[in-house]
Structure formats: structure tokens, C-alpha cells
């Protein structure tokens, strides 16, 4: 709770300074299910939390207009020890790296900012970009939402059931992303929730095809 309140307070302060415009139509908050990300064992060097964690915040154009990546050459400035760094390590865990290495080198955060965050400039600078992603994550408790609809870790459900459960809180279509495990079973890997550039309302996501939505398959929510 304290970290969430801190993120909200920092968001209000820094966003009051420079509300300018970036050239994108919407942005997708991509949340990873750590149990699927860290399978098979040995892939992660952090204990996977039993909740969704941030992969990234991806600005983009509407369908048929292309995907935005590496929009500027702006450098990533490492976060120094303090409240923002602690919040990032809680909400945006660098699962592939030991904590000390992640905090020192910040590889995931650097990669996401260079690839996607630069496309939010000048509307959102680096600090605003990361604070915004964490604030948007706090808007939705997807794990509780899924559980409310009987979708619990270790069970399989259709694409439509998972999508409809998430729509009860987003009101707009989310983007489900899947991976196929070594047994050939589709697993829920990530959930994308889309927002307008101002982040003041939801936006229908462009749909990935990794979950084979037209076939409405059974998808494993890994325990």
C-alpha cells in the first residue's frame, strides 16, 4: 500500500510539470504472468511473484499504421537508489537477473525505455514514463479479477472466457498473449491493456494471434 501511495504522489507531482504531446494513438500496458515467463526452471534469477508484473508500456499507432520502436536516440539514465528505484523493483521486476545485477545495470528498464519509452517523448519524459506505467498497473488487480471468474493458477480456460473476465474491469478488449510450452500446451503469458495517450480512458487493443483467438482454444494459467 505504501509503495502504491508513493507512486501516485510522485505521478501527480511530476506530471504537473510538463504535459506536452507525443506522436502516438494509444499505448498498451503489457503485464507478464511470471510463472509462465520463468518456465522452464532456471530461466529466472528472481523468485517469480504470484502476481502480474510489468513488461512494458508500449505506445503505438492505430492498426495498419505501423509499430513504434526506437523513436529517438535519447539515452536511458539509470535510476539511483531511492523511492522510484524501490517501486520499480516491486512493480517491474527484472526476473531474468539477480536483484543486485538488475539494480546495478537496469537492463530490462533500459531496454524498454530505449525501445518503447522514447516513442512517448516529448509527452512523457523518462521518469514520467516509468511512473505512468506503475500507476496504470495499480488501476487493475487482474489476478483477483481472474479468480473472481473461476480462472485460477493451474487451470485451463477458453480464450473467450479469459478475455471476457478481463473486460469486466477494462470495458475494452484486452490483448492476450500466449506461449506454447514443451508439451504443446498454450499458456497465458501476458495481458495487454490499452489506454489513450492521455491515459485518462481505456482503448481497444489491437489483437495478437499467439493465443489463436479464432479457434478459442483452452489456455493454461500456469501454477
From Swiss-Prot:
Annotated tissue distribution: Pistil.
Subcellular location: Secreted, Extracellular space
Broad class of enzyme this protein falls into: lyase
Domain of life: Eukaryota
Organism listed in the record: Solanum tuberosum
GO BP term, example: RNA catabolic process
Transmembrane intervals: none
InterPro entries associated with the record: Ribonuclease_T2_eukaryotic (IPR033697), RNase_T2-like (IPR001568), RNase_T2-like_sf (IPR036430), RNase_T2_His_AS_1 (IPR018188), RNase_T2_His_AS_2 (IPR033130)
Keywords: Disulfide bond, Endonuclease, Glycoprotein, Hydrolase, Lyase, Nuclease, Secreted, Signal
SUPFAM superfamilies documented for this protein: Ribonuclease Rh-like
Catalyzed reaction equations: a ribonucleotidyl-ribonucleotide-RNA + H2O = a 3'-end 3'-phospho-ribonucleotide-RNA + a 5'-end dephospho-ribonucleoside-RNA + H(+)
Any one annotated GO CC term: extracellular region
Disulfide bonds: 38-44, 71-119, 178-211, 194-205
Sugar-modified residues: 51
Binding, RNA: 55, 94-95, 115-116
Active site residues according to the UniProt entry: 55, 112, 116
Signal peptide stretch: 1-22
Family: Belongs to the RNase T2 family.
Main function: Self-incompatibility (SI) is the inherited ability of a flowering plant to prevent self-fertilization by discriminating between self and non-self pollen during pollination. In many species of the Solanaceae, self-incompatibility is controlled by the single, multiallelic locus S. This stylar glycoprotein is associated with expression of self-incompatibility in potato.
GO molecular function, one term: RNA binding
Enzyme Commission number(s) from the entry: 4.6.1.19
Protein name stated in the entry: Ribonuclease S-2
Amino acid at each position: 500500500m505504501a509503495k502504491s501511495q508513493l507512486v501516485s504522489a510522485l505521478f501527480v507531482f511530476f506530471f504537473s510539470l510538463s504535459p506536452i504531446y507525443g506522436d502516438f494513438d494509444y499505448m498498451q500496458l503489457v503485464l507478464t504472468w511470471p510463472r509462465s515467463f520463468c518456465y522452464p526452471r532456471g530461466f529466472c534469477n528472481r523468485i517469480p511473484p504470484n502476481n502480474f508484473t510489468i513488461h512494458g508500456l508500449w505506445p503505438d499507432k492505430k492498426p495498419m499504421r505501423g509499430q513504434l520502436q526506437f523513436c529517438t536516440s535519447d539515452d536511458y539514465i539509470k535510476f539511483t537508489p531511492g523511492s522510484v528505484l524501490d517501486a520499480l523493483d516491486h512493480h517491474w521486476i527484472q526476473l531474468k537477473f539477480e536483484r543486485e545485477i538488475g539494480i546495478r545495470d537496469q537492463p530490462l528498464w533500459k531496454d524498454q525505455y530505449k525501445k518503447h519509452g522514447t516513442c512517448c517523448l516529448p509527452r512523457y519524459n523518462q521518469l514520467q514514463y516509468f511512473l505512468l506505467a506503475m500507476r496504470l498497473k495499480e488501476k487493475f488487480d487482474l489476478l483477483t479479477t481472474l479468480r473472481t471468474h473461476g480462472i485460477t493458477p493451474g487451470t485451463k480456460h477458453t480464450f473467450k472466457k479469459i478475455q471476457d473476465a478481463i473486460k469486466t474491469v477494462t470495458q475494452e478488449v484486452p490483448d492476450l498473449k500466449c506461449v506454447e510450452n514443451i508439451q504443446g500446451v498454450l499458456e497465458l503469458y501476458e495481458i495487454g491493456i490499452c489506454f489513450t495517450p492521455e491515459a485518462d480512458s481505456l482503448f481497444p487493443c489491437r489483437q495478437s494471434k499467439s493465443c489463436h483467438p479464432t479457434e478459442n482454444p483452452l489456455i493454461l494459467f500456469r501454477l
